[in-house]
Amino acid sequence: MSLIRSDFEHLLALRTGLRRFLHWSEHQARAAGITPAQHQLLLAVKGHPDAAGPTIGDVANYLVLRHHSAVGLIDRAAAAGLVTRGPDHANNSTVRIALTDTGNEKLDDLTETHLEELKHLAPAMRSLWRALEADGTATLRTAALTPAPNPG
């Protein structure tokens, strides 16, 4: 595959858009009184498909952390009153993570804000994907490199 300038422009636009969203998301988490990592943890717990809750290994996988780093994050979140640990009902040696009421409320508030922001970003992201598929560099620059309006 021979790379051309637009390949780099597309990759830059995609990474810039992702970084801007992540930066915004981190700011939202801090404004809610939690760290960005705690926000990701809360989302990993509530978004986990098993109603029993994720294991520490599941959390490590979702957050791309080593097991001991996930343990530390869970410890800090538990100390902050965001999550609890409990044994798995089928296997007492397995630890499951659950949200507290406080953790659930913070995540619900952040998720509402994030979904609203994603609705605003959706048109630009659709344009970006179309540009990536069609190699439309001008559309790509307009869609991804122009800051999104800040509602409110």
Outline where the language-model segments fall.
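Histidine kinase transmitter module recognition
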Residues: 17, 21, 48, 62, ...
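Short, structured helix-loop boundary elements
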Residues: 7, 11, 35, 56, ...
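Pre-recognition alpha-helix immediately N-terminal to the DNA-recognition helix
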Residues: 13, 20, 40-44, 105
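N-terminal helix-turn-helix DNA-binding core of bacterial DNA-binding proteins
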Residues: 23-66
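Charged, amphipathic alpha-helical coiled-coil/dimerization segments
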Residues: 75-133
